[in-house]
Amino acid sequence: DQLRLIERGYEERILRCGGCGVEARFRGDERVGFGQGRMQPWTKDDLVPLTEVGEEVDKEQAQVLVINDTRVYVPVAESVLVIPPESRVRKGTVVDRLYRNSGDRSRIDGARTPLARKSIVRTLATEYRCVADDIETALADLARGYPLYGENLTPGQLRESEFKAFLEELPDQREDEDLVTRNRSNKWRELGSTVNLNAEEQKIVSGVRHLVRVDRLKAVKVFKGFTRLGGEEIVPPGIAGELDWLPAIELYGEGIFLALDEDRLKVWEKAPGVVSRLNQLLPRFAQSGRDTPNPVTTRFMLLHTLSHLLMRQIESEGGYPAASLIERVYCANGPEPMAGILIHVAVPDIAGSLGGLAELSEPQRFLRILIRALEHSRWCSLDPVCSEHEGQGPGLLNRAACHACALVPEPACEFGNTLLDRGFVKDDAANGLPSFFGMT
């Protein structure tokens, strides 16, 4: 109770014992050695010579952090989108209402006798304005796994399903569905014949295979727990480990989805200069101990950096603050490759947002945004320092990417503003880096 932390700005902190008056001073970014070769109370043993203790612990360096420092605890969350068939479930049906109302289900499960259960079912039938048999039928559907009926997918498979859902044109969509999309790919490809484009702009148009307007989407974000600094084990929200559920939040919004041309991408990602630039980054990523939903490949670096450039341009064109935007990168090689980007907004209000972001996905407007984003990739106000940087940011995991050109507010990025490099987007002939959008 007598130990006090006295802060005199970030530069000086004092840890003082009120009982004996002993104090230690340290800076916020200072690293200190353990023990500094002095005998500690718990090592008073003839079997542990002082010199061995000092030699062993002096090699270790520690950084003193206050207990509420944001670097001490790292939240672990998983976010998924609601896609068909779940997104197409009609709202207001008996089974849908029971599915969304865990309290009513708990009342039924908590009945101690069959007679009490029957009474609760009749009461719910009156509240739902249906008959008791409808409640029983809905409960049977829920027991079979409604609405997914036992389908169990990994995070990678969920991303793949989301990617396919954006490419699929859904017939007879209703405005109350949780995923409402309008494919603009045909109109995008027709830009070359309907609008006077130069050769460079034609290449940009052909580099995007799919463009989808997302009028409505629903995201579910689940808090899985947190990790402590230096630890890998996830501490669950219920620290005692007795809970069989996780806290989650439902978010609603709109967005823009685009997918790059796969044939051109396969040629670009094999270019020697592109592969060489990635190989310079991979050892740092391995040493960082970080984990990402996607393998770090050349196509991932292109997609992730392009996503940031687009978010910054959307902030300028559409008036959306970058902190309100969220990215989702769909990236995979192999037999079912993915190369897509979703930029969306998400708010707790079930009404969603006002539609301004979805409007930017109209082909002519989005082409203007994409062209300007690519133009901004070629220069930075901190060049040549930024473009020639060998490594910057957390873990030195960024190359040509800084706050003046490619970084966005932390909530907008899936990967903590790391793994960014404008070199993968812009044309850099001097270093043998071809531009994806400059290829034919």
Which residues does each predicted region cover?
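Extended, well-ordered protein cores
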Residues: D1-T440
